[in-house]
Amino acid sequence: MIREPYIFLSQNYAKYAENETASAASFKNLELSSLPRVLTFYLTDKYGNYINRSIDTLLLEDTNIVSATLEYEKDGQYYPWLTLSGNADTTVLLKDPFPVSACAIRLTIPEEHNPDVVTIGKLGFYKYLCDLCAETDSSFKVDANSGSYRTLSGDIVYYGDYGKWESKIKISNLPKEQFETLSQEVKDTSELTIIPFKDFDFSAVYECYLDPQIEYEVNRKTELYELKLEAQEL
């Protein structure tokens, strides 16, 4: 068993729009010039329906963005949320200690301090579920049938590919509140974003299918939970 910290986040469900026009445009591999730019992201459920969602975390990958501000919309009004300033990292995780309930997020990228062309490989808005040292047994799934489709559970379809990540994760000493939050998210969506850490740094960010049939035990003396999850990279 490998013992290393994991971060568990809700899955990123949103639709990207610019100029206040909702669309299903991808917000991966963005190249933004002619700054300043204002981007709007409408939060959805896993089926694409617009909803209010509780979020507290911004994750940026493969980016050269230096500074930006974010606002969240509630009841038709935008309020200040997160600020990025002086960033020099290509992967950024910003967490608000207090979750906000929002239906949309507005990202403003100013001209000042940013490069002429801002790139964002991937952007997502999440709910931070928990992080702790989880006992894990991780391996890379080798699929000899690359290009085929494979049904995992119900309407979940996995596109066969080489080197997909899969893991059995055992989380020990989990307080009841975190156990309930994490297990309910798995039951509701069967998807999580999982960030394994190696040497206290990002090793990768995985969007995963989770088997909704979870296993758990509770220590009656400590009232702490042990939760077992099976994850496969989408």
Where would I find each of the regions flagged by the language model?
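Beta-strand signatures of extracellular beta-sandwich domains
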Residues: T69-E71
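Extracellular/virion structural assembly segments
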Residues: M1-V38, Y42-I65, Y78-L234
